[in-house]
């Protein structure tokens, strides 16, 4: 696969992360000898080196000679890798994996892997030594989708924040000046009711102002807004059109929550799980609906590895659609007559023998690589977006089972 000078797309970076994580997850150590270190972006590399040095010293107390040697070798390898970094890690931090993994027949191989700049910032430093690498936090980052606005309010207070992946981030809060329902002596009931309504209206405007300040600048990136609180507060707030008009269209739903402090934001996320799951699949569903429309009535659809690849080379693919669950390699064959052919196989299988379909001669394997990498490399060169499609809905499952996991929506018809 040719090297790309341009910065890889976000989808491509996530896919590369996913591949490495799946490989690391399969490794096993014969004892607690596989070391994982999560390093947040604000952690000085010198502090990490000092911690690794301390762990190396403490590892000398491990009773098993083999485990002791393997742990210390892993820590030495990590220190060697850390020398390549300046004062701080790259953006979003980094994760270092190192250890002697079982390779069968009683043998071990030393593996060291560094994953830089994960999809979300690493929040805290973590040192982990076990019989398996700690990959779950990274896997959760890759599974996280979307940016959502959160608003919780009652007539006493309000909190506004973000849901970024699975991370709830409180940002703004306000307390109301709405008086209780009991009026003070000397006030007429009518005047008290009017003043109370004015205070409620002012508070709703203040909440909307917080939300507008936070969400409007991100209105083209935000995937939805959840609003929570008791009835009728949240209903009055939404029905009163207090939110900016471009944000009103982003509201996914309103939900009953008991608390409106910062903890209420997490309660709101829990209450809105169904709406969030549906929103996460919205883009995938839209892509697949368009694909099926073009497949059934238009001419701007292609599917299957070979047809999709040929359209990519012609530059005719607007969006490359790939199943998230696809795990295949592509084997490239050449025959004595210089015909080149491609065959996709399960990445766990050995390459099969191949006969050239053009001339019938026996073909020789000349290369083998990850099939998705192969297509994305062409897509990057042609300005084609790559969208990974979930199998958590019917048409997404059909992409994998009925169309081989590869499809494309075309810019123009090619007849291929």
UniProtKB/Swiss-Prot annotation:
One of its GO terms (molecular function) is translation release factor activity, codon specific. InterPro entries: eFR1_2_sf (IPR042226), eRF1_1_Pelota (IPR005140), eRF1_1_sf (IPR024049), eRF1_2 (IPR005141), eRF1_3 (IPR005142), Peptide_chain-rel_aRF1 (IPR020918), Peptide_chain-rel_eRF1/aRF1 (IPR004403), Ribosomal_eL30-like_sf (IPR029064). The keyword Manganese does not apply. Its main location: cytoplasm. It is found in: Cytoplasm. Keywords: Cytoplasm, Protein biosynthesis. Signal peptide: none annotated. One of its GO terms (cellular component) is cytoplasm. Pfam families: eRF1_1, eRF1_2, eRF1_3. SUPFAM superfamilies: L30e-like, N-terminal domain of eukaryotic peptide chain release factor subunit 1, ERF1, Translational machinery components. Directs the termination of nascent peptide synthesis (translation) in response to the termination codons UAA, UAG and UGA. Heterodimer of two subunits, one of which binds GTP. Belongs to the eukaryotic release factor 1 family. PANTHER family: PEPTIDE CHAIN RELEASE FACTOR SUBUNIT 1 (PTHR10113). This is Peptide chain release factor subunit 1. The gene is prf1.
